[in-house]
Amino acid sequence: MPTATPATAPVTTTDVLIVGAGPVGLFAAFQAGVLGLKCELIDVLDRAGGQCTELYPEKPIYDIPAVPGCLAQDLVDRLLEQCAPFDFPMHFGQRAESVAEIPAPAASAGHAGHERLLVTTDGGKRFDVAAVLICAGAGAFAPQRVSLPEAAALEGRHVHYAVRDVSHFAGKRVIVAGGGDSALDWALALRKVAARVTLLHRREGFRAADGTVAEMRRAVAEGEMDFVVGMLGALRTEGADGGLSEVEVRTRDGSTVLPAEELVALYGLVSEPGPIAQWDLDMRAGRILVDTTTYESSRRGIFAAGDIAFYPNKQKLILSGFHEAALALRKAYHYAFPEKALVHVHTSNNAALKEKLTHA
């Protein structure tokens, strides 16, 4: 459960906070820079890319204008390269928890008289912004957890959904459960430090890169690690601290017991609206209803773009999200600079911008 952010935590002041660093969020950052807006990005994941990076990095994408075809991860890499000249701060492992209006008299220096928003995250960060652009895809991602009732008490100690510190597994018997790239990558990596690593998957086939699967099978054949086909059946503990000692595995032939002190379950991610669902926004089936002239939500200064935005005839396409973000930021500009008119200038005719983009 996230801890409360102290009211005295430092506050970062910027024009726009972008929630979500997937393709739409990254393009939004680029557009913010083009418009002359300062922005910062937050994402609950530990790196940029959203679903494209975490769920299907090798999925081919064919419907991006002027890009006949590319892999999902390649698209993310290109978007990162595109917005790099603006060098916007990105804060990973941060989930937006709450948003509150800052009364005009209490607004930060330089913005007195204009209502702004204070966004807090579960990681202790606070942002004073003119606008929030939510590009969180289908919502915040969370790991798919082990469904066994005894797993909850072991989470963070002996049951893990990510590898934060490899040294924690040194000299221990480790089971890595899952059949995707992350599961195989970490099983191969941990075999170098653990006493023994067993990869556990419900079937012989994998949802991973062919080269990674081949490397895993070679490591198993040469006795560097083990592979078991089966599913988690029970977690057994021992000792005063109730540490994990064995894992019961259901197999085709019945069951078997594997010694284990650590379990790394990498079953993929599931999406959930998260705290944004409590932000007093008009929502439809977990998505944010927006005005299609500005992509602003029912709450002033909060915008949505990408899969999380809802409106009639909405198309869940990355290119649609690009369009939505571009229009949202033009309205956000007026909140950031209410005294200034936004004059449209083609990037090719803006000498300063052209210099930044071509000589970054």
Swiss-Prot record:
Family the entry assigns: Belongs to the ferredoxin--NADP reductase type 2 family.
InterPro entries (UniProt xref): FAD/NAD-bd_sf, FAD/NAD-binding_dom, Fd--NADP_Rdtase_type_2, Ferredoxin-NADP_redctase_2
Keywords: FAD, Flavoprotein, NADP, Oxidoreductase
Keyword Cytoplasm in record: no
Cofactor: FAD
Record's protein name: Ferredoxin--NADP reductase 1
Molecular function as annotated in GO: ferredoxin-NADP+ reductase activity; flavin adenine dinucleotide binding; NADP binding
Catalytic reactions of this protein: 2 reduced [2Fe-2S]-[ferredoxin] + NADP(+) + H(+) = 2 oxidized [2Fe-2S]-[ferredoxin] + NADPH
Domain of life: Bacteria
Annotated binding of FAD, by residue: D43, Q51, Y56, A96, F141, D307, S348
